[in-house]
A protein has these predicted regions:
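A short Gly-Trp-Pro
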Residues: 1-136
Length: 136
C-alpha cells in the first residue's frame, strides 16, 4: 500500500512511500537553493525503510556547512533531483516535494535558514521560523 508516490520529470525514476512524512519543511540555505535552482527547497522526510524506488538514479555528494555528507539523487535522463540523504541523519530520506504526485499532502511546518533566504521570497508567517537548523 502506498501512502504517497512520485517521479522525476521524464518518469524513468518512480518511488512510493508506505508511511506519512515524519516532517515537511522548507529550506532556504544557499546549498539547497543552488542544488535546486529555486529560491528554496521543500522536503518531505521519511524513514528509508518506508521508501521504495524503481529506476536508475545517479548521485552527487558534497559537504554541508555543518560538515555532513549531503547526497543528492537524480535521474540521469532528465536531471530531476528526486531525493537526498544527510549523513548526519542516517536512515532518513528527504524527498523533493516537487516530485510528489499527491500535492495535497505537502504541508510544511517550518522554514529553515531564514537568515539566508532571498529577500523577495514571501514567507508564510503561520509556519515555525528558524534562522538556521533546529536541534531536533
Amino acid at each position: 500500500m502506498s501512502i504517497f508516490s512520485g517521479s522525476c520529470l521524464c518518469g524513468s525514476v518512480n518511488y512510493k512511500s508506505n508511511s506519512d512524512p515524519l516532517v515537511i519543511q522548507n529550506c532556504h540555505c544557499d546549498q539547497c537553493r543552488k542544488a535546486t535552482g529555486s529560491v528554496y527547497l521543500t522536503n518531505l522526510f521519511i524513514k528509508e525503510e518506508n521508501f521504495e524506488i524503481t529506476g536508475e538514479v545517479h548521485n552527487y555528494t558534497h559537504l554541508s556547512d555543518a560538515g555532513n555528507n549531503m547526497t543528492k539523487y537524480f535521474c540521469p535522463k532528465c536531471g530531476s533531483q528526486v531525493f537526498g540523504k544527510n549523513s548526519g541523519r542516517p536512515g532518513i530520506i528527504a524527498i523533493r516535494a516537487g516530485t510528489v504526485n499527491e500535492k495535497d499532502i505537502i504541508k510544511p511546518i517550518r522554514n529553515l535558514f531564514l537568515k539566508s533566504k532571498v529577500p523577495s521570497t514571501p514567507i508564510n508567517s503561520n509556519l515555525e521560523a528558524c534562522e538556521g537548523m533546529p536541534l531536533n
